[in-house]
Structures are given as C-alpha cells and as structure tokens.
Amino acid sequence: MAVVNIREVYPGVSLGLWQMDEEVEQLFEQYPHLQAYKSSLEEKYKNDGRKLEFLAIRALMYEMLKANGASKGLLSHAGDIIHNEAGKPLFRGYHISVSHTKGYAALILSRNQEVAVDIEYFSDRVERISSKFLRKDENASDLDSKLVHWCAKETVYKLFSEENLKFDDMRVKPFDTMSDWACDVENLKNKKVAHVDFELTMEFVLTYAAM
C-alpha cells in the first residue's frame, strides 16, 4: 500500500494522502472490491495514469473508512464515489473532496462539515499563469506564496462548489509562508471567510479547509 498518512485535521474531519507509486493491477489485487470497476475503466481511460488516480482515491477511501471504524458493509462500498452536475464528489453519508497531482492523491472527509482539499506538485509553471488567478490587491511575490494562493483558491472554489466562483471572486488575505501555515480566503460573493490550512513540501503544496 502507498498511504502516506491519514490524520484528523479538525474535529470530525479526516485527511488522507496517497503516493501513487504502484501499478494499476497491484491495486486490483490489494483491493478486490475495486475489481467491479475494471471493465468500465478499460473503456473510459486508455491512460494508466487516469486509471491509477481513480483507483488510488477509492483505495484511500477504504483505508480512511477503516481507520474511522466503518462497518464491513460500508467498506464494501468504499469505491462508490459519484459526482453531481457541478463535479462535486459525493459519498454515502459523508461530505468529501478529492484532488490529484503528479504522483499523489488526497482525500478529505467529514460526516457533518463541508470540506475541500487541493494538491499541486511543486513547479514554477505557476509563475506563467499567476495573472489568471491573482487579484491586484493580493500579495504573492515569491513562488511559494503564488502556489499557496492558487491552491487555496482551488480549495475555496470546491468549498462553495454551488456558487461557481471565479478566481477574482476570492481574495486571499496576507499571510507568511514561513510561519503561518494557514491563510484566510474571503468569498467576495457571500462575504464568508474560509480558513485554509496549507503544507509546503519539496514535492507538493497541499491545502484543505472545512466549514
């Protein structure tokens, strides 16, 4: 298995991280309940990378439910993640959010809070597109800060998925990537403020929130 960690990040909110370093067939062997998706995956995706993303999230869901003491009946349905018309993932009795990036998959879940997560691999490509997601009244002078702004806004977009927010509809309040490890993001449409925690590593930026 390739679970990096599963932890409670807020009361009643679990966050899981999976490193996708296995082959597709290994996941089918390790998690027999995923065999039910084999034919549909073959039809839908030609690329093994997309298949691996699909399976890794569902394997991670299984491990997180198991860690939370879920019944065998619920564990047998750990792959039953669907999406609504807005693209928001849904799972029976839980609020969930998922994200993938190069080599990693992340999942956050809660029974009673809206949750959101985003993960992006560490790259300077964000420099080239920063004008698309940064507002003029936001301060993001270095690469780390720009990555956090980007991921934090993606997280808040998911948190308010029904509102179909644009990047300019969100404003990240000033923060320090060296000491704060969290930032506040204002939804300018409804005036609500989301507290977004973030983690910076040599490989990725991870942001998550709950409301």
Show where each model-derived region lies.
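Core catalytic alpha/beta fold that binds nucleotide/phospho-ligands
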Residues: 1-211
